[in-house]
């Protein structure tokens, strides 16, 4: 039910380095890292990559590049509107003519919010922060479309379980964050709604072990799970399971042929690509 392909290396996985002149820097120039690239094909439009620039998360600014020829050539980088970061880790979705980008901030406490555009990405608005119980911190949401028409977003948390929030107005407002039964060890995840209405989640489905000081568990195993409602998840397949290292920051999409494509960091050395056949998915 799966095939795999290793590609590139850890250095390439970090993305390009952008040189920016910094005032009062005696050397004149300072190298700034690019973070969390998100590539997205706007239906009927450009192929875009959203990313962040900054030496630390608190200094992030949002940027993008675009391609009009399927990725062969790219524009110069463009800054996003001040105060907007774009999708923070996971892909946007297009729903009823609206692009909705899942995002979050870490400065001043982990908080989810969403940015949305009604003109295919030309201009953007943003939501309020998603409310949560005291002590529940969440980042890096992934959006699903439920069968009843609502949107749901699952998110990484520090609370040993995946968080979920809902929208009934196409992404303008979101419900208070709830914790579901599926474990999360403070590691990135992604989700996608399939053409048949089911949802698929890729994540490290283990709780944070007791006694861990930094609040992060081992990012292994890496599992793929399936759900009918976005809340109750069934294990489908384990992609990786080794204590040697970690398998992290996964992304998942469904292509036009129905196949699922998973990409993730393999032991902090390479990027791995795995293709899954949903026809072999057992209910």
Q: Language model features by range: what are they?
A:
Residues 1-283:
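Asp-box/BNR beta-propeller blade signature and adjacent active/binding-site loops
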């Amino acid at each position: 039910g799966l095939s795999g392909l290793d590609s590139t290396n850890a250095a390439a996985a970090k993305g390009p380095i952008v040189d920016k002149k910094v005032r009062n820097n005696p050397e004149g120039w300072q190298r700034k890292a690019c973070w969390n690239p998100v590539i997205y094909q706007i239906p009927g439009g450009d192929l875009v990559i959203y990313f962040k620039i900054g030496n630390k998360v608190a200094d992030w600014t949002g940027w993008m590049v675009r391609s009009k020829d399927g990725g062969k050539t790219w524009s110069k980088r463009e800054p996003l509107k001040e105060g907007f970061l774009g999708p923070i880790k996971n892909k946007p979705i297009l729903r009823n003519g609206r692009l909705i980008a899942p995002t979050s901030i870490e400065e001043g406490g982990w908080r989810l919010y969403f940015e949305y555009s009604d003109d295919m990405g030309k201009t953007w608005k943003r939501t309020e922060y998603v409310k949560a119980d005291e002590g529940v911190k969440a980042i890096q949401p992934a959006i699903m479309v439920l069968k009843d028409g609502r949107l749901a977003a699952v998110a990484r948390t520090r609370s040993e379980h995946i968080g979920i929030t809902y929208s009934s107005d196409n992404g303008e407002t979101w419900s208070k964050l709830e914790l579901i039964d599926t474990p999360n060890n403070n590691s990135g995840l992604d989700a996608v709604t399939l053409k048949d209405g089911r949802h698929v989640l890729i994540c490290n489905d283990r709780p944070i072990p007791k006694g861990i000081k930094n609040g992060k568990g081992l990012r292994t195993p890496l599992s793929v799970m399936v759900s009918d409602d976005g809340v109750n998840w069934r294990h489908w397949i384990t992609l990786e399971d080794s204590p040697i290292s970690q398998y992290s920051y996964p992304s998942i999409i469904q292509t036009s042929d129905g196949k699922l494509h998973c990409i993730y960091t393999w032991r902090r050395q390479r990027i791995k690509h795995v293709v899954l056949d949903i026809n072999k998915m057992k209910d």
